[in-house]
């Protein structure tokens, strides 16, 4: 273990606690509004995955390693059985964790991701665009935004990516460990589960009606790995359900 995951805690009631995991290049802040809404009924933790946000950096960025980090964090917090909710990459970590440690899962919620392989080509140009940015020459976040615009034309998505940019001692730095994520992107894009693996516990898959990440043709695979699952659709939502 390289360190303890950074977390944000909301609420004091409700057991078992709810643990929320973000997607690739996200952070715990992505769950803040949802966590605050649920805080009256649950004790909620939103975590930064390794190589993201304020959590530690290391070269092993595999889903398996992240699931082990989650186990260490739960043990450090003295939490037994939890409800685990993961979005996108966080959903893959949650699936892996549930299969590895089923007794630690009360209920499982997977947000807009399936237990399948995804083409890494979607993420590679994004990571390479961020890695190519010359941070030493930046004077403002606006300059970073302008420099990325040609490679990442969607303004809203650029603002999401730039949440990873932080200024310290007059210099800009990436909070995410981009080089480790780029080196691991093939593994991060693949199915986190082996063909024969199953999780028998109660599982909810939440799907964005306008997202292509969890489609009707993926549901057979969902049922194979998660036989006690159901799928709910948010018709007007895209991939970023929260």
Task: Show the residue positions of the predicted features.
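Flexible "cap/lid" loop of the alpha/beta hydrolase fold
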Residues: 95-100, 105-140
């Amino acid at each position: 273990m390289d360190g303890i995951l950074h977390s944000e805690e909301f609420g004091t009631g409700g057991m078992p606690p709810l643990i929320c995991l973000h997607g690739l290049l996200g952070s715990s802040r992505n769950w803040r509004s949802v966590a605050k809404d649920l805080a009256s009924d649950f004790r909620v933790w939103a975590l930064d995955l390794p190589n993201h946000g304020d959590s530690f950096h290391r070269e092993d960025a595999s889903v398996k390693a992240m699931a082990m980090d989650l186990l260490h964090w739960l043990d450090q917090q003295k939490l037994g059985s939890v409800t685990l909710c993961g979005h996108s990459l966080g959903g893959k970590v949650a699936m892996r964790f549930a299969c590895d440690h089923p007794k630690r899962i009360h209920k499982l919620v997977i947000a807009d991701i399936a237990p399948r392989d995804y083409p890494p080509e979607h993420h590679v140009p994004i990571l390479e665009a961020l890695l190519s940015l010359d941070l030493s020459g930046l004077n403002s976040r606006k300059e970073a935004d302008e420099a990325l615009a040609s490679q990442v034309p969607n303004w809203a998505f650029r603002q999401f990516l730039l949440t990873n940019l932080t200024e310290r001692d007059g210099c800009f730095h990436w909070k995410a460990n981009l080089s480790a994520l780029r080196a691991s992107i093939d593994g991060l894009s693949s199915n986190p589960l082996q063909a024969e693996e199953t999780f028998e516990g109660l599982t909810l898959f939440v799907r964005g009606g306008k997202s292509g990440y969890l489609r009707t043709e993926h549901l057979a695979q969902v049922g194979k790995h998660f036989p006690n699952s159901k799928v709910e659709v948010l018709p007007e939502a895209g991939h970023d359900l929260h």
